[in-house]
Amino acid sequence: MRFSAIVLTDHSPAVFLQMVRDVEAAGVERLWTYDHLSWRHFRDKPWFAAMPLLAAAAANTSRIRLGPLVATPNFRHPVPLAKEIMTLDQLTGGRIDLGVGAGADGPDATVLGDEKITGRQRADRFHDWVELLVTLLEQETVTATSGSYAAVDARMTPGAANGRGLR
């Protein structure tokens, strides 16, 4: 049996990192942290950004796999997200995982001023977002359009830590 753990980003960075080290010491295989700008009852409480905390976790661990859970098109464009994941993969020596989802209604969906969308629109947007994200993670240079998402001469160098595409 394999174990994964979730450590929320509602803790100070120092506490978050101690929890990450404790989870790794316990032999857990994978650690996720929620990739939200705020979350549920934590909306008016401290909540830190996932990607910088994952970078710090990479520097404080050596074995455990790390990743955001879940990244969504609610506030993430595929180009900067792919660059962040590629960078985290390099920082971890290939120990990065990426959880993705369509995104739900709520603060993450409206914080950038976007209109609420239907479930069908959300599914279509997710398809387009994943299509471009996967292309970016697999290729060194990308010029592509997928629905309302575009990448023009986007560079994903040096790519995956293991020399293969990030899949």
Task: Locate each region found by the language model.
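N-terminal beta1-alpha1-beta2 module of alpha/beta enzyme domains
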Residues: 1-60, 164-166
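Active-site beta-loop-alpha junctions enriched in small/polar residues
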Residues: 6-10, 36, 71-73, 101-105
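Loop/helix-junction capping segments adjacent to catalytic residues or to phosphate/diphosphate-binding pockets
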Residues: 13-14, 75-78
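Conserved beta-strand positions in the central sheet of alpha/beta enzyme cores
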Residues: 32-33, 65, 99
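Short, small-residue-enriched loops and turns at beta-alpha junctions
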Residues: 39-41, 73-76
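Internal, glycine-rich beta/alpha segment that forms the wall or movable "lid"
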Residues: 43, 77-167
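Alpha-helix-loop-beta-strand connector modules within alpha/beta enzyme cores
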Residues: 44-67, 125-136
